[in-house]
Amino acid sequence: MDYLFISSKTDPASQNIKKHVQNYGYDVFEIEKKSTQSNSSDFPISEMYIFLSKHASESKKPTLTVHTPGNLTEDNSRGGNSEEISPCNPIFNTLMLQNMNKYNEMEEYQELGFDVSFEVLHHGPTDLKAPSAFVEIGSSEEQWQIDDAAEIITNSLIDTLNSIQNSEYEKKEKIIGIGGGHYSPKFTKLALKEEYYIGYLTPKHAKLSENILNQMISKQDFDFVGIDWKGLYGEDKRKYVEFFDENDISWQRV
C-alpha cells in the first residue's frame, strides 16, 4: 500500500509529529494551509492519506485520536464539501487505535495521562479518492508540544503500516458504527477488545441523509453496520434500519 504522510505548517502538533516521523527516515508531504481546509488537488495521488494533526477541545483533556474526515451535514464550516465523506480503511483506523493504546499503556508513557479513542466523522477534506485518516494529539497547546505524545503516534504509525504492508493482522469482520458520542466510546471499546475492524463512525446527534448512508456503504469495505442501540434516538433507529433493510444491508445491534 502506497501512503502519504501529510503535515500542515500551521499546526504545532503536526509539526511535532512530523519531526519524529522524519527522524525514522520517512518522508512527509508538507502544506501551507490547515489540513482540514485542504482538498484532493493539494496532494499527489496515493493509496492512503495520513494527516498528522492536532486535536482541540474545550475540555483540554489529553487525548490521542484517529478518525476519517467527512461532513455528515450541510455544515462545511470546518473544511470540505457539504454532505461528503472521504473513503475509509477500517483496518488502518483500528490497528492505529490499538497501537496507540499499546504504547500509551507502557510504563514510560503512563504518566502523560492520555486517553486513546476514535472520533466520529467531522471536518474536511472530503473529496479524497483513497482512504484517509487523521492521527491526532489533543487537546490543547500544552499537549501538542509533547515529544513523547508524538513518539507514541509515530511508533503506532510504523507498527500499523508494517502490519498492513506485510498482511500481519488477524482476519476479523469489518464494520461501520452508528450512534453514541463524539468519541464513540462503544466502538472504541469494541476495537480495543479486538472484536472488529471499525471504520466510519457517526454520532447520536447526526441526522444521516440517504446521501450520506449511501456514501458510507460504498466508500468503505464492510461486513455489517453496527448500531449502538442505546446511543441513538428512536426515530433515527427506525429510519436507518428501514434504509438498511430496503437495501439488503446487514446490520446488528452492538
Curated annotation (Swiss-Prot):
Gene3D superfamilies: AF0625-like. It holds the Pfam family tRNA_deacylase. Residues 65-84 have a biased composition (Polar residues). One of its GO terms (biological process) is D-amino acid catabolic process. GO terms for molecular function: D-aminoacyl-tRNA deacylase activity; zinc ion binding. The keyword Hydrolase applies. Transmembrane segments: none annotated. The keyword Secreted does not apply. It comes from the Archaea. Binds 2 Zn(2+) ions per subunit. Its cofactor is Zn(2+). Its EC number is 3.1.1.96. Keywords: Hydrolase, Metal-binding, Zinc. It catalyses: a D-aminoacyl-tRNA + H2O = a tRNA + a D-alpha-amino acid + H(+); glycyl-tRNA(Ala) + H2O = tRNA(Ala) + glycine + H(+). Residues 61-85 are annotated as: Disordered. Monomer. D-aminoacyl-tRNA deacylase with broad substrate specificity. By recycling D-aminoacyl-tRNA to D-amino acids and free tRNA molecules, this enzyme counteracts the toxicity associated with the formation of D-aminoacyl-tRNA entities in vivo. Belongs to the DtdA deacylase family. This is D-aminoacyl-tRNA deacylase. The lineage of its organism: Archaea, Methanobacteriati, Methanobacteriota, Methanomada group, Methanococci.
